[in-house]
């Protein structure tokens, strides 16, 4: 299976890429920084936030897309989270409109906010940071 991974050089992305390649998948790695990306993956220099409707084709029409890219993920109150929200949404809409059938978008514990105890898909979201608010808004918009 051909799998595109955005944020492929990031904190989680580099391990996702390695695991997928180890499992025999063809991996298209997308990131602004290529350092740390498994050499067996194909690097794709496409700007996923350009708003171009043909972004799926530029990625090589993968069978699946795992969207991990997120600027300033460790800076929880960065203005970038809200500033870039529409770009994330447009990127994902363009994938769907182009026919991509399998898309996974990484969420975060910051969507839940402060919560003690076990969480599951029914745990209410109460994000407290710009990061959590933006991630939650993207999930709700989709």
Task: Annotate the PLM regions.
Residues 90-130:
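Conserved Rossmann-fold NAD(P)-dependent oxidoreductase catalytic core, especially the SDR/UDP-sugar
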Residues 25-36:
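Conserved glycine-rich Rossmann-like NAD(P)H-binding loop of the short-chain dehydrogenase/reductase
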Residues 48-85:
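NAD(P)H-binding glycine-rich loop region in Rossmannoid oxidoreductase-like domains
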Residues 6, 30, 65-68, 103-109:
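SDR active-site strand-loop-helix element
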Residues 3-23:
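N-terminal Rossmann NAD(P)H-binding glycine-rich loop of SDR-like oxidoreductase domains
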Residues 128-142:
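Active-site Tyr-X1-5-Lys
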Residues 15-19, 94, 141:
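Rossmann-fold NAD(P)-dependent oxidoreductase module
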Residues 38-51:
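Rossmann-fold cofactor-recognition segment
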């Amino acid at each position: 299976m051909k799998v595109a991974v955005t944020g492929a050089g990031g904190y989680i992305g580099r391990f996702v890429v390695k695991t997928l390649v180890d499992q025999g998948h063809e991996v298209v790695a997308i990131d602004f920084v290529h350092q740390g990306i498994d050499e067996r993956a194909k690097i794709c220099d496409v700007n996923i936030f350009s708003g171009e409707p043909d972004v799926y084709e530029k990625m090589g029409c993968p069978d699946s897309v795992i969207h991990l890219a997120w600027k300033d993920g460790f800076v929880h109150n960065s203005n970038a989270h809200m500033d870039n929200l529409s770009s994330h949404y447009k990127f994902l809409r363009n994938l769907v409109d182009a026919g991509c059938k399998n898309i996974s978008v990484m969420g975060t514990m910051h969507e839940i906010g402060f919560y003690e105890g076990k969480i599951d898909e029914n745990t209410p979201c109460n994000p407290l940071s710009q990061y959590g608010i933006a991630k939650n808004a993207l999930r709700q918009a989709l």
